[in-house]
Amino acid sequence: MSIPVFGLGTFRLQDQIVIDSVSQALTLGYRAIDTAQIYENEAPVGQAIQESGINRDELFITTKIWIANLSKDKLIPSLRESIQKLKTDYVDLTLIHWPSPNDEVSVAEFMSELLKAKGLGLTRQIGISNFTIDLMKQAIAAVGAEEIATNQIELSPLLQNRNVVDFAKQNGIAVTSYMTLAYGKALAEPVIKTIAEQHGATPAQVILSWAMQLGYGVIPSSTKAANLASNLLAQKLCLNAADMALIATLDRNERLVSPDGLAPKWD
């Protein structure tokens, strides 16, 4: 099994806004949807999916276990609740959203429990998010690298996270990029704008294409149908080696997501 290269993110979208975003995306041809327990939008996401009438086996639904639900007694019940909210019988991928702060719950405990959830048929694949190299090593020790479908991390032209990417690749763990556009900051980079002009593309398409050509999955979000459609077309854009080399020079380790009390010690 593998994970989709392109999907729809739903972070910060709630209620009717997320219903509209997911509905529009599905109509346009999106088939992978990324949500999380902490987004508090699993139910409206599920509603939009249900109302679309698209066969479940055509869809790839990802959710993430929040830190309050990492312990052995809470993880599987919380995932069952997520599945119920999503109005489905299973999810395709379940991630540990963040490692447990201060190791309150050990990596071995929550990864073993997540693997058990897979064994129960609640999730087809399992993975991790916001994991450093050390945390990936612990996860691999707990369940084996072959069980970890992806590490979903903040990754953009401004934060290329090469050490984490290299370690993941060496262990056969796919990388999914979130915040690929760096909250829009990367769109304003002159290098990105120039490449976009040369290809008759948008800056967002250039960045998404860059990430996909490096082998990363992407999950951009939008509430606008035009942007949803435009982002989807990034899959058809092919950047050349010179373009890729120029974007590589933009890396400045500029991390935008590092919540106090939640973020691990980054590589």
From Swiss-Prot:
One of its GO terms (molecular function) is aldo-keto reductase (NADPH) activity. Its main location: cytoplasm. NADP(+) binds at residues 179-231. GO terms for cellular component: cytoplasm. It comes from the Bacteria. Keywords: Cytoplasm, NADP, Oxidoreductase. Belongs to the aldo/keto reductase family. Monomer. This is Methylglyoxal reductase DkgB. It comes from Yersinia pestis.
